[in-house]
Design a protein with these regions (language model features):
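Short internal beta-strands
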Residues: 37-44, 221-225, 356-357, 376-385
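Nucleotide phosphate-binding/pyrophosphate-handling subdomain across enzymes
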Residues: 3-14, 24-34, 142, 274-378
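Short, conserved loop/helix-junction motifs that constitute active-site signature segments
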Residues: 178-181, 211-217, 235-237, 348-350, ...
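Residue-level signal for inorganic ion chemistry
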Residues: 31, 78, 119, 148, ...
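Phosphate-binding loop of NTP-binding sites
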Residues: 29, 70-73, 82-225, 229-240, ...
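C-terminal helical cap/extension that packs against the catalytic core
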Residues: 52-54, 59, 368-428
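N-terminal leader/targeting and accessory segments in enzymes
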Residues: 1-103, 107, 301
């Protein structure tokens, strides 16, 4: 089915689109252009939506805004925004009455005419997705990047050619209701995350598993052999399994031998590059490259991989060097919205650092983070709703002694950053690596990271 054929099938149906945000706005415009009866639903007020509300209404949309935006859903087809659970009472009631529940990404999987690689995991998704996309581009392929990053791809599907590649980053929220899988699926790692939304860890893992659950023989699934959960998932994959590992040498996949990154495929082993070729800091980025190499095996020449690794500076908000100020290096690692991500960031630095952490409570335990902070942090500056929980995890960790590390609780966010600056000495590293989501003070981790950068870059020499 093509995108146009799908849209034609909706012309005599009513459609609701929940969420007037970045991912759904192009969809709304396209539906309205096709003359489809559309209701646009959003919790935001008309004032907050601004000119977009006027534009949609002028194009023929019915707006359903505010706290009751989910009430009375009776449309034939309902597009769910990824952040909304599919089992909220209003959606369940609509489905009982005959409504079809779908999403922008689910329909894209139905109509996408080209090859598809999708990446999920708790950490490393964006960097791995970006590496895969850039490697394919460097090899001369036409690439479309979407999902959690890039552009919404559904409305671009008719412009894609069969030989193109769609490279997607998919979250557990997007995957929850998926019933199709990509040609090449990558699971970077899995650890507790988003437990404020998911019922439990089992539901979170099950959602992630949809990325490879519906593959067919001949498809490819890439897993982290060093992660307990993903190693078990590899045994349930239908497609060809490729593993990546820093600690062992899988029969099929990518692994580390000393400082060399090697690939073993169909019984043949070859050296791709060394870890020194990777410009990005941290062992977690070695893992990101190994996952990407496993995904593009046979598609990208080894020399292109090596040349790219030597020059790629990474993605914004991921251990991003913001500035050196009075001899102190400031890093923006705002993407670190889970303990495992912060741990990876801390391990990237050879010295003990000044850490700014804390934020929105996703109900993730911090017990694994405590010992890492004791080992890698000289001063801990806490800010946000989880400050008390992180402090408790550190103070209860083995090896903790009073003031080792010293712990400060400072609000608001700007003052926390300034407190880190005031305590830092030449040669120190200050890193924003919160271990939490940003929603208690910011719209998202990107706004938090940009705010941090603006504060640091605003200081006069």
């Amino acid at each position: 089915m093509t995108l146009q054929e799908y849209l034609t099938s909706l012309r005599h149906k009513t459609v609701a689109v929940i969420g007037i945000g970045v991912s759904n706005t192009p969809l709304l415009r396209r539906l309205l252009t096709e003359g489809i009866a559309v209701t646009a639903c959003d919790r935001s007020s008309r004032e907050k939506l601004g000119p977009l509300a006027d534009e949609l209404e002028a194009a023929g949309a019915t707006l359903h805004l505010g706290e009751g935006y989910l009430d009375g859903l009776t449309q034939d087809v309902i597009f769910r925004t990824p952040g909304l659970r599919p089992d909220v009472p209003q959606l369940l009631a609509a489905q009982r009455q005959g409504s079809t529940l779908t999403s922008e990404m689910e329909v894209f999987f139905q109509v996408c005419p080209c090859h598809m690689i999708a990446v999920t995991g708790s950490d490393g998704k964006t960097t791995t997705t970006t590496i895969i996309a850039e490697l394919l581009k460097a090899a001369g392929r036409t690439v479309h990047v979407g999902g959690n990053i890039g552009q919404p791809l559904l409305c671009q599907a008719d412009d894609m050619e069969p030989e193109d590649w769609a490279v997607l980053e998919l979250s557990s929220f997007q995957l929850m209701t998926m019933d199709r899988s990509p040609h090449i699926a990558v699971v970077t790692n899995l650890a507790p995350n988003h437990l404020d939304v998911h019922k439990d860890m089992a539901e979170y893992v099950a959602a992630k598993e949809n990325i490879f659950r519906y593959q067919r023989p001949g498809d490819i699934a890439v897993f982290n052999q060093d992660n307990d959960i993903t190693r078990q998932q590899a045994g349930r994959a239908v497609g060809t399994v490729r593993l990546f590992s820093r600690r062992s040498e899988p029969e099929e996949g990518v692994f580390l031998r000393g400082e060399d990154i090697l690939c073993r495929h169909n019984g043949q082993e070859r050296r791709i590059m060394t870890t020194a070729d990777i410009r990005l800091p941290g062992v977690h980025n070695v893992e990101n490259y190994m996952a990407a190499i496993a995904a593009v095996e046979g598609l990208v020449p080894d020399g292109i991989i090596r040349d790219f690794a030597r020059t790629f500076n990474g993605v914004e908000h991921r251990i991003e060097l913001v500035r050196t100020y009075h001899g102190v290096r400031y890093y923006n690692d705002s993407i670190a919205s889970s303990p495992s991500r912060t741990i990876a960031g801390l391990r990237s630095f050879p010295e003990q650092v000044i850490l700014i952490a804390g934020g929105y409570d996703k109900h993730i335990p911090f017990d694994v983070l405590g010992p890492e902070i004791v080992e890698h942090v000289k001063l801990l500056v806490l800010c946000g709703a989880t400050a008390g929980k992180i402090r408790a995890a550190v103070e209860q960790a083995p090896g903790y002694r009073p003031d080792h590390p010293e712990i400060l609780e400072v609000t608001p966010f700007q003052r926390a950053v300034e407190a880190a600056r005031d305590r830092a000495q030449p040669g120190d590293v200050v890193t924003l690596s919160p271990a939490c989501a940003a929603f208690d003070q910011f719209k998202n981790f990107m706004e938090r990271g940009k705010t941090f950068k603006a504060i640091v870059n605003g200081w006069r020499e």
